[in-house]
Curated annotation (Swiss-Prot):
This is DNA replication and repair protein RecF. InterPro entries: DNA-binding_RecF, DNA-binding_RecF_CS, P-loop_NTPase, RecF/RecN/SMC_N, RecF_2. Keywords: ATP-binding, Cytoplasm, DNA damage, DNA repair, DNA replication, DNA-binding, Nucleotide-binding, SOS response. The RecF protein is involved in DNA metabolism; it is required for DNA replication and normal SOS inducibility. RecF binds preferentially to single-stranded, linear DNA. It also seems to bind ATP. Belongs to the RecF family. It is found in: Cytoplasm.
């Protein structure tokens, strides 16, 4: 699949913008704070209905504007489609081929992207929250029902925490707590099982990619980390019973503290290079290679699941990679996927993928196209 064109209205520092993209490589060149990342972000938002930079949709609306919109034309094997998002103080609306979608989970997944930004290099050594977000967003692209299940889980978790807090201060009937606990467990089992499957598939692709980058000197494995389930795998029924036993065991502790003490909202995953935890023991180079391997594996995983390669977004990441890793990434781009990347300068990047790219110059929210 590829993004043929995009139209922005009052999106961040863009009042109006219409661009047509190459099916292969597109380069956005400009100094910092001119709008390159904003443009890349708008494509990510078009696909996933949320930003990777902020949780506040209001920040996406331009200065002194009341609303913002993004519209993209996407070409897939099955034909061409139009996707659009609009944002206002009242909320956001998502449309597929001009039909409004009642749930965002019905919208997400129709257009797939993989974003690689400098902060993704820190996913290996960063916080568990960042890794959970990575899991949630990527699983949501290949399994949109996951986002619905996750939203239901978080809603139930919020209700359960509020009730636990009430019980810890005022006491009361625990009948509702039992109902919410059962609902939470059912959703938790679905979420964890989908995460296990995703981790297995991601590792299947990431390991050979990592071996290729390191010239067969390193192997990469991924381990899902849960305080409920160790390395062993369980059936759906076994997982439900294990959760139930643990909730029963810590019931008084949760009531006393007024909060849910475990579940997929606290889980994590770990990366191992040659059986050593790369988060703890890996060099910066190993951590960056692991992050690059994850991103390249995402591309292959999405292709396997949906039958088409996603769009690759690179936000000023080439300058963060050494020549060897840079070449490996550019080789992947040139062979398989439409790519849109940002940079302040392409001088010194001799790779044919860049030399043959469609180039856009970005300055103060204005974009000019250059032929190469």
């Amino acid at each position: 699949m590829h993004l043929k064109s995009i139209r922005l209205q009052n999106y961040r520092n863009y009042e109006t913008l219409e661009l047509d993209f190459s099916e292969q490589t597109n380069v956005l060149i400009g100094e910092n704070a001119q709008g390159k990342t904003n443009l890349l972000e708008s494509i990510y938002v078009l696909a996933l209905a949320k930003s990777h930079r902020t949780t506040q949709d209001r920040e996406l609306i331009g200065w002194e504007a009341d609303a913002a919109s993004i519209e993209g034309r996407i070409h897939k094997r099955t034909g061409e489609s139009v996707q659009s998002l609009s944002f206002s103080p009242k909320g956001k609306k998502a449309k597929l081929n001009h039909l409004e979608q009642r749930r965002l989970s019905d919208y997400v997944g129709a257009f797939n992207v993989v974003l690689f930004a400098p902060e993704d290099l820190a996913i290996v050594k960063g916080s568990p929250q960042g890794r959970r977000r990575f899991l949630d967003m990527e699983i949501g692209q290949v399994s949109p029902v996951y986002l619905h299940e996750l939203n239901q889980y978080l809603k139930t978790l919020k209700q359960r925490n509020a009730l636990l807090k009430q019980l810890s201060t005022k006491g009361g009937d625990e009948t509702l707590l039992e109902v919410l606990t059962d609902q939470l467990i059912e959703l938790a089992v679905k979420i964890v099982m989908r995460r296990y499957h995703f981790i297995d598939q991601l590792e299947k692709w990431a390991n050979p990619i990592h071996s290729g980058i390191t010239r067969d000197l390193e192997t990469l494995t991924i381990q899902y980390v849960s305080d409920t389930f160790q390395k062993e795998r369980f059936s759906k029924e076994q997982m439900f019973e294990t959760y139930r036993q643990k909730f029963d065991k810590i019931r008084e502790n949760e009531r006393r503290r007024g909060v849910t003490l475990f579940g997929p909202h606290r889980d994590d995953f770990e990366l191992y290079v040659n059986n050593r935890n790369v988060q703890t023991f890996g060099s910066q180079g190993q951590q960056r290679t692991a992050a690059l391997s994850l991103k390249l594996a995402e591309i292959e995983l999405i292709h396997e699941e949906v039958g088409e390669y996603p769009l690759l977004l690179l936000d000023d990441v080439l300058s963060e990679l050494d020549d060897h890793r840079q070449t490996h990434l550019l080789d992947t781009m040139g062979r398989k996927v439409q790519t849109i990347l940002t940079t302040t300068n392409i001088d010194g990047i001799a790779h044919e993928t860049i030399q043959q790219a469609k180039v856009f110059h970005v300055k103060q929210g204005e974009v000019e196209t250059e032929s190469v």
